[in-house]
């Protein structure tokens, strides 16, 4: 697994990127491509359950799929245990090589 960059270069003083927030059942590859074409700078996948990724569920991996043209791209995962989150994070980083991981700890 590669090292994580200490900061995200597209954020910083004087930078205001258009960030596409993840939306369950909406933020798929096609939707993200449309948003990128309309000016989105940074995008993230809809959230995916860590256990589904660990079990190699095809639908879960489809949900975290993205194209090179959609970078910078993040993958959002959620889970019930730190161990499953860590394992899923390693799998996603090794297989998909996202620019960042977004850990969902629950919506308000």
Question: Model regions: which residues?
Answer:
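Glycine-rich, positively charged N-terminal anion/phosphate-binding segment
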Residues: 2-8, 23-99
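Extreme N-terminal starter segment of soluble prokaryotic enzymes
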Residues: 15-18
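Short, flexible active-site-proximal loops enriched in glycine and acidic residues
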Residues: 97-107
